[in-house]
Amino acid sequence: MTAILEKTEVQSLWARFAAWIVSTENRLYIGWFGVLMIPCLLTATSVFIIAFVAAPPVDIDGIREPVSGSLLYGNNIISGAVVPTSNAIGLHFYPIWEAATVDEWLYNGGPYQLVVCHFFIGICCYMGREWELSYRLGMRPWIAVAYSAPVAAATAVFIIYPIGQGSFSDGMPLGISGTFNFMIVFQAEHNILMHPFHMLGVAGVFGGSLFSAMHGSLVTSSLIRETTEAVSTNAGYRFGQEEETYNILAAHGYFGRLIFQYASFNNSRSLHFFLAIWPVVGIWFTALGLSTMAFNLNGLNFNQSIVDSQGRVVNTWADIINRANLGMEVMHERNAHNFPLDLASVEAPSING
């Protein structure tokens, strides 16, 4: 009798670590993108919470008039925010070691840049992690492609827009009222509501919500019953079953009769592709619009009113929007400049006589 002895190969610590990182058997997949994502998102989240609760006021406009954003300095959940980095810093990289003291770093809004940069790296890695897990499982990569839409939108407001405007102080504040303030100022300075790409984004978000609600309600209403009337329909479902759980033809027939035949899908793949692509493309366009307006390539500006043959102004909706934009711009950074930039850009009259 011959005994066959096999030499057991001892794996190195690194090999075992690498196998654990890319294992799809873990409860939560880590992946190589996760190695960078986890510390970045933990850092961003921790600093955001601390700054939201306790950060001192920030000199956002760079004019020695600090703005309070934290809860301990008089704000509530609605008005609180992590205030953007000071205009005095501009686009300079501003880690803690660039400031003379921690107090100076806080005064100039260093936490905002720290949170935004780590958050940006984190969400990009999350998108890469989605692709990585799909690749390991032999799936197609479209989950990561869909997630690229919100990543593009976040990149536009936190990275591209400050770069285009020349300062991180123009980035979106990290808070509820700060977000609304950013939107109002953006409208005042760029007339975003009159930009076709923003209109496509609105159609994508609201249309996606409508289509999602329609699809969910149709599926829920056409479940295949495997039980009696006395028992819940859900009791007939087995997790992971191969059989269809709802009748797409019944849903197609219902919706076709409700509107018209070709308004509904009878192909499940086409239906779900449409549900995915509609909001994603809309948000892509919005991010593209934000990124172009960052460099002052603005929306459709109707700066000249329509006049009749007698020179009288024919009031239009564009006049109302223009007036609202000027009013919002007057109130924005009211201590930093006295007039809206649209009015202040006109050459001053000579005073030399």
UniProtKB/Swiss-Prot annotation:
It is found in: Plastid, Chloroplast thylakoid membrane. The chain crosses the membrane at residues 29-46, 118-133, 142-156, 197-218, 274-288. The modification Phosphothreonine is found at residue 2. Keywords: Acetylation, Calcium, Chlorophyll, Chloroplast, Chromophore, Electron transport, Herbicide resistance, Iron, Magnesium, Manganese, Membrane, Metal-binding, Oxidoreductase, Phosphoprotein, Photosynthesis, Photosystem II, Plastid, Thylakoid, Transmembrane, Transmembrane helix, Transport. 2 of the reaction center chlorophylls (ChlD1 and ChlD2) are entirely coordinated by water. Herbicides such as atrazine, BNT, diuron or ioxynil bind in the Q(B) binding site and block subsequent electron transfer. Its main location: plastid. The modification N-acetylthreonine is found at residue 2. HAMAP family: PSII_PsbA_D1. The D1/D2 heterodimer binds P680, chlorophylls that are the primary electron donor of PSII, and subsequent electron acceptors. It shares a non-heme iron and each subunit binds pheophytin, quinone, additional chlorophylls, carotenoids and lipids. D1 provides most of the ligands for the Mn4-Ca-O5 cluster of the oxygen-evolving complex (OEC). There is also a Cl(-1) ion associated with D1 and D2, which is required for oxygen evolution. The PSII complex binds additional chlorophylls, carotenoids and specific lipids. GO terms for molecular function: chlorophyll binding; electron transporter, transferring electrons within the cyclic electron transport pathway of photosynthesis activity; iron ion binding; oxidoreductase activity, acting on diphenols and related substances as donors, oxygen as acceptor; oxygen evolving activity. Chlorophyll a PD1 binds at residue 198. Chlorophyll a ChlzD1 binds at residue 118. GO terms for cellular component: chloroplast thylakoid membrane; photosystem II. The gene is psbA. InterPro entries: D1/D2, Photo_II_D1/D2_sf, Photo_RC_L/M, Photo_RC_L/M_CS, PSII_D1. The record marks 190 as: Stabilizes free radical intermediate. CDD domains: Photosystem-II_D1 (cd09289). The record marks 344-345 as: Cleavage. PANTHER family: PHOTOSYSTEM II D2 PROTEIN, PHOTOSYSTEM II PROTEIN D1. Gene3D superfamilies: Photosystem II protein D1-like. Tyr-161 forms a radical intermediate that is referred to as redox-active TyrZ, YZ or Y-Z. GO terms for biological process: photosynthetic electron transport in photosystem II; response to herbicide. Belongs to the reaction center PufL/M/PsbA/D family. This is Photosystem II protein D1. It is an enzyme of class 1 (oxidoreductase).
